[in-house]
Amino acid sequence: MLSQFANGTEAASRVFTYEVQGLRQTEETDNQEYAFRRSGSVFINVPYARMNQEMQRILRLGGKIVSIKPYTGATASDEE
């Protein structure tokens, strides 16, 4: 079991969904593959290995992470 985590096999397959509110529209966010409004929530799927980088990016853009859940394959509208 430890070897699975050590070589990253299991960790690499884990994905989490961030629910983010309050992102500002900037040149950097214009290049994203998803559209958002400042008042709405954005759902971003993030691989386990990039969680810290993505948190820093969201905070830098003025967003607030309101929830983090394991990705189940369901769309955001299915979960609500």
UniProtKB/Swiss-Prot annotation:
Transmembrane among keywords: no
Localization per Swiss-Prot or TrEMBL: Cellular thylakoid membrane
Domain of life: Bacteria
Record-linked InterPro entries: CpcD-like_dom
Family matches, as Pfam families: CpcD
Keywords: Antenna complex, Membrane, Photosynthesis, Phycobilisome, Thylakoid
A single GO BP: photosynthesis
Classification via SMART domains: CpcD (SM01094)
GO cellular component, one term: plasma membrane-derived thylakoid membrane
Domain (CpcD-like) ranges: 13-71
Membrane topology qualifier: Peripheral membrane protein
Function: Rod linker protein, associated with phycocyanin. Linker polypeptides determine the state of aggregation and the location of the disk-shaped phycobiliprotein units within the phycobilisome and modulate their spectroscopic properties in order to mediate a directed and optimal energy transfer.
Annotated family: Belongs to the phycobilisome linker protein family.
UniProt protein name: Phycobilisome 8.9 kDa linker polypeptide, phycocyanin-associated, rod
Native species: Picosynechococcus sp. (strain ATCC 27264 / PCC 7002 / PR-6)
